[in-house]
Structure formats: C-alpha cells, structure tokens
Amino acid sequence: MRILLSNDDGYLAPGLAALYEALRPLAEILVMAPEQNCSGASNSLTLSRPLSVSRSAATGFYYVNGTPTDSVHVALTGMLDTKPDLVVSGINNGQNMGDDTLYSGTVAAATEGIMFGVPAIAFSLVHKEWAHLGDAARVAAEIVRHYLDHPLPGQPLLNVNIPNLPYEELKGWRVTRLGKRHPSQPVIRQTNPRGEPIYWIGAAGDALDASEGTDFHATASGYVSITPLQLDLTHTQMLGATRDWARAGSGAS
C-alpha cells in the first residue's frame, strides 16, 4: 500500500509529523507538503511562476514552494510512477467544518487527489494549539486502516474532524453532513507606517446550523465527524427553475 501525505500547515507542522508516524505501520508513505503555512489557500494552483521541490534532511519530507494543491499535483503528476492507494491530508491545526471546507487548504490537498482518481481523506483537529495531537493521530490511523481494509466504493473524499479530547473520552465515529456558519467577521482595518490602509481578514463566523446530524453537532458531542464530500457543485434542485428562467430570457431577446 502507498499513501501520499500532505497538509496545508507546512512541512514543519506538528500535525504532519504526528500523522506520518501514525501511518508508517500501515503503508509506504511519501510526504509532499507546502514549504510555508497555506491555511485558507483553498484549491489554488500556482500558474504565475515555476515551482521547486526540496527535501528535508531531518525528516525526508519533500516540500514545494507553493500551495497544498500544488504539492499533491506535483507529486501525482511529476514524482510518482504509479498512483498511490490513498491521499491523506492533515492533521490540520483547527477545524474544517461547514463552510470552512470551501476555503480549506487541508481539504483542497485531498480534493486534488480525487481530481486524479485517487481516494482521499482530510483530517483536522477541532481546536488549535495541537492539544491531544497524539490521540488525534491514533484516530486518523484507525480510520485509514479501516479504509484500506474495507474500501468504500468509487473514489470517496472524506472530511474528518476530531475533537480535542483524550482518546478514551472520544465517543466514536459519526457520519455527518456539513453544517453552516454565520458570515465571517468584518475585515480589521489598520494603517501601515506610510499611513496607508491595510486590512486583516476577520475571524470565521460562529456556527449557524449546528443541528443534529451536522459536523458541528457531532464534534461538540464528543464524536469524530466523518463527512463524505463531492466535487460536483451543481445545484440540482435549481435546474428546473433555472431552465425555465433561461428559456424565458432567450425567448424575450
């Protein structure tokens, strides 16, 4: 078995090292991660300049001076002779639930695997500062082992969020849907030394839909949340109304 491991916090992140150690007994692991922290990079590819790949003398991890998506893209199309059995991303320093998934570099690295026909799993710790990271890595390894032993049909993309709890206090796994957040806080305006305005992106909004069945509800209740994602963004319930709207517009023109 071969696993391609990446993240969005960078190749020096504790979450990457912990996940690597937890997965080593399960498969051959190739690590390719961003050189820098790329949180919030989403699915961006670097098209304006060439990329370079380096290797850490300390860990053997490969890293690229680009985004999480670049990392997986370069590994799959430029380094590996054969496809890995699984792409794994994480462990992220902070949750990726609800609307977070659209911005998340952690989820994006996993998504790039799906783009090339490789099943993928993204792992995140619900709260920052790496509390109970070893326990989270243990859970992640259990999920990966279960997937390798009992693969899901097709090419699944799983988004996993793990509460920051001791292993013994976790209540198990729960399959969930994405919740929803309130809009993020407004940007924070400041002034640079030249007197020019600069802006910091505000904090994420609080949970708007954290009802039972959502990732927010599961993790708040002490469960590991597993959400199957898909790349098709088509709003199928709007197809009929949009078709009628377009037909009316084209007929009037």
Swiss-Prot record:
It catalyses: a ribonucleoside 5'-phosphate + H2O = a ribonucleoside + phosphate. Gene3D superfamilies: Survival protein SurE-like phosphatase/nucleotidase. GO terms for cellular component: cytoplasm. Keywords: Cytoplasm, Hydrolase, Metal-binding, Nucleotide-binding. It comes from the Bacteria. Binds 1 divalent metal cation per subunit. Its cofactor is a divalent metal cation. Its main location: cytoplasm. Belongs to the SurE nucleotidase family. HAMAP family: SurE. This is 5'-nucleotidase SurE.
